[in-house]
Every structure is written in structure tokens, then in C-alpha cells.
Amino acid sequence: MRIWSPISSTASLVVAATTASTSSTPLGSASPAPKWNTLSGKTTRLIGHRGEKAFMPEHSLGSYWQAALEGADYIEPDLGLTKDGHLIVNHNEYLGGTTNIAHIPELAHLKSNKTWVYDVDGREKTVYNEWFVADLTLEQIRMLRINQASEYTWRPQHFNGYFGILTFEEYLQVVRNVTIELGRPFGVIPELKSPTLYNRGRPYDRYFEDRAILTLEHYGWANITRWINRDQHIDLRLSAKLRPLGAAVLGPSVWQSFDMDSARYLAQHTDVPVVALVEQLPWAFTPAGLDRLAGFAKILSTWKDIFVAGPEAYLRHYNITWDEKDIEQMGGFIAPKDLVREAHSRGIELSPYTFYDSRQDMAYICQDDNAESKSEFCPKSKAEELFYFFDMGVDYMFVENIVEASTLRLQYDNQLAQAA
């Protein structure tokens, strides 16, 4: 099987992405599109992880446009909340690693330490000597410029300092604009980062969630289904004039959260499906755990190695403990080959993360020579990796270098069509 090389030419990216997002059935052909093993029977949908971070600084205007041009089905933002209550787009709760904040003397005094309950594992987490989103006003955030992560030497660095941090509202305007300009819908899939941190010191416990809900509703991607205290958000100044869609149609919307209480709240208060992000919660990978998740989540998203090493081997490798009796009572850990089937039988779709640029290590336990356990399958190339998950029938994938993933998806689709 051919291993696909990364494509660096912008023109080639656009052409390849356009081709890869087109149905494999020839125009005018009576042959139906091949049926995939996904819950819907349609192709696995590709989520641009933080936009297109393989080529642009993550979560930047350029990253989101690049993801759209490359044919992503969804474009992902991560949300944080500033000191003065503005929703902004940034992956970490802090700003030192991906911005130029260390070089702005006026903000030096805001460097601090912070402890909060981390939503990934439910444990206290402390970050030292950082600038936290929650401690800066939007005016101060506007002083920053985004940089590409320098440790990934193959990623272009020439866009460093070019883009500023976007607000959630600006992100939604970008997606609305690319929908109109490119004539196709793009899904929005915001992740609410660390709700326990961002709700600290706010007027009430779900202030962060409600702020996001009201913004998504304003832009036409959500309907509110339960009462929300709008009086606490009268300062939320959203754009009064939206660009007309014309013939364009907005894509779908989906919430994401590692915090199960926050995820449940989002599901209860909007008609927007929720992704339960789960990585270090052992109970979630049991039959009874999936039953519990099905009560509020339409999609389960977890680290991809859960589907290769299996839940038990993965959790043991990272020293995550559990009560053996509790897991046994919940039906035991589900084998990796059965995870998709068990989830689909409950109406839950699957969205593993993260599928990297082929120049980056895939980060599976089985590729570690010192690992105690080895998997039945261990990918040796990007093609082998993606085809394994396509065969399984995962419904979504968080991907970087979207063109690579789109091209391989098209190749797989063509093979299905030929085998039909």
C-alpha cells in the first residue's frame, strides 16, 4: 500500500481536498455510494483539529480558512473565558506556549500559578509560572499574536506573529463566511475547556456554559430547550447584523466536553448533540458505562489507542487505577474490536483523536519497544492507521493534515466501491 507524502503546495492542497471531498461515484452513474461501517452508513467525517495546525498556527484565522479549503467536515475551536467574560478561542487554559505573551512587558505582572480540578481525569492540576486566560481582559488578549509550535520543525513558522486570538463570535463569523464563500456547509464543534476553572468567581455555577449557549444560539447553530438566566448576560454584546447566507446552508453543530456534568448540562439546555470526551475514566469503557453515556451523549470521543491497545492495557500503561469489582459489575472492559459495535448498538457514534500529520509519531503504545503489552494490530503508516479505523466504522476523526486524511478516505471509498 502506498504511503502518502504530505503536500505543501497551497494550490495542490485545494485541488486535492476538492477531489477528496467529492463522491467517488462517477457523475451520471446509477451506482449507489458504497456503504461504510459507520452508524449512518456514510463516510467517516473529518474534524479539523484546532483548524489546520499542520500548516498554520492553531486556532488562528488562517488555520480555520486552511481547514475549510482542505475540505474538513467540521472545524474545531477550544473555548476559554477572559476575566471580563469574553469567550475566546485557545486550546490551553494558559497562553505561554502558543503566543508572544512572554515578550510583552505590560503583561509580565499577570504571570502566576493556578490550581483547579482538571476535567480530563477529575484530579487537581497545578500549572506554574503561566499567563492564564481567566486573568486577562479581552483588551489584553488583543495584544497577543499566535505562534506555531516550534518543536514540530516541519510545520511552517513563517506565519508566526501574523494572527491574533479570536473570540468565539469571530470564529462563528469565520465559519459562516467560509460556508458562503465556498458554497458548502462546515460543522462547528466547540469544546468547553475546564468549566470548573472558568466558572470560578463568576455570578453562578454554569455561567461559562450559558455564555457559550447564548452565542451559538445567536448565530443560528443552537436552539435553547430549557430556561437560562439571560439577565446575567445582558453585557453580552453579539453582532446585530449577520451576513446573509443566501443559498448557503449552515453545517451541523456539536458540543464537546471532558467534564461529564458540563456535557450533561449542555445536552439538557440545547438541541445540539454532545460529544463526551473520555480518556481516563475506566467506567466509560464498559457496557454499563456506555449505557450511562447514552443518557446524554450522542458521540463518544476518546484517545485512538483505546481502539488499538484496548481500554485495560491503555489504562494500565498510563497508571490509571480502577476498582476491579466495580468494573466487573459494569460488565468488564469492552475489547477494542467490539467498542464500535457496542457503542453503535446504543445509538452512540465514535470520534477517536488525534490522527497526526504523517511526519509526526503516531504515539501508539505498541510502537514503544519498552511497552509491556503488544497489540494484535500496530500501524506502520498513516494509510494502515486510517484504514484500520475506517474498517472499524468510526464515525468521525480528529485529524491534522486534512488533505492526507481526505486523500486516504477517498482511496478507501474507492476500494469499497470496487468491492461492491
Segments predicted by a language model, with ranges:
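Phosphate-group recognition and catalysis centered on beta-loop-alpha active-site segments
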Residues: 2-6, 13-420
